[in-house]
Regions:
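A membrane-cytosol interface segment of integral membrane proteins
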Residues: 101-122
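Long, non-transmembrane cytosolic or organellar matrix-exposed soluble domains/tails
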Residues: 196, 200-238
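Catalytic core of membrane glycerolipid acyltransferases/transacylases, capturing the structured
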Residues: 11-18, 54-108
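A cross-family acyltransferase "interaction/gating" segment
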Residues: 140-213
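Catalytic-site beta-strand/loop segments enriched in glycine and acidic/polar residues
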Residues: 121-150
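Membrane-anchoring hydrophobic helices of lipid-metabolizing enzymes
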Residues: 1-62, 70
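Generic preference for hydrophobic
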Residues: 49, 58, 79, 201-203
Length: 238
């Protein structure tokens, strides 16, 4: 029954929450990667990977509530996330442990504060995931990029390491039906509907952003990522 799988999911995160005080930050990141891979295997979510990551800001497209599991299974790190996640019972403390930058998307001061933190972030030593769209895109598409990570790469000199990943099941897109769902509703639907998917991940060439190149590089990366998404993000029976 799906309820037992849902209970396992809750147990999975309760255990991770209780372990936040038992490990160093780096040890905990390694633990997260191991656990994310086990969770993916349990739900028969096969992750196919091409290429290897290089040091830098980790920039990935954002389609689904499954995205955090996928990126952590590949490379655990901190992330930029909306402030609401900080108050989630289990997710907040786990996110804080790995290093999170919180942003109030509707608050200009908050966005500016995050940009200032990004400008001081050592992305080569402390991996940080950023979804440049700032929100989830529709399955098979890619919303315009915000400039935060590109400006940070320009100001710090750190590379951007792009990752594009594509699902072969449109049901992973929580806005697919036209009704925006919250995280917990999406998780419940994942189990009730027995949603299964494969994920095709491509580590792209690292990107250097020179002075005054932020917008140009953002447009360039968006164009390249969209080619992958149009080619690989489609139902498996097509």
């Amino acid at each position: 029954m799906w309820i037992f799988e849902l209970l396992y999911f809750v147990y999975f995160f309760v255990r991770l929450r209780l372990e936040t005080g038992l490990y160093t930050k780096e040890e905990y990141k390694k633990l997260l990667t191991i656990r994310a891979r086990k969770l993916s295997k349990r739900y028969n979510m096969k992750i196919y990977v091409h290429g290897k990551p290089q040091p830098g800001f980790l920039a990935a497209n954002h389609t689904s509530y499954l995205d955090p599991v996928v990126v952590i299974a590949l490379k655990a790190g901190g992330a930029v996330s909306k402030i609401e996640v900080k108050d989630y019972l289990l997710f907040g403390p786990i996110a804080k442990k790995v290093g999170m930058l919180w942003v109030k998307r509707e608050n200009k001061k908050s966005r500016t504060g995050v940009i200032n933190q990004l400008n001081q972030w050592n992305a080569a030593k402390d991996p940080l995931w950023i979804f440049p769209e700032g929100t989830t895109s529709t399955y098979g598409d890619l919303d315009p990029f915000k400039m935060g990570v590109f400006k940070a790469a320009e100001n710090t000199g750190h590379m951007i390491q792009p990752l594009v990943f594509c699902y072969d099941n449109p049901l992973v897109d929580w806005g697919r039906t036209g009704k925006e769902k919250d995280l917990f509703t999406s998780i419940i639907d994942f189990y009730k509907d027995n949603i299964r998917t494969n994920v095709y991940c491509f580590w792209m060439e690292p990107m250097k952003v020179g002075p005054g190149e932020a917008q140009m590089k953002a447009d360039e990366l968006h164009k390249k990522m969209l080619i992958y998404i149009k080619r690989f993000e489609r139902p498996r029976d097509e």
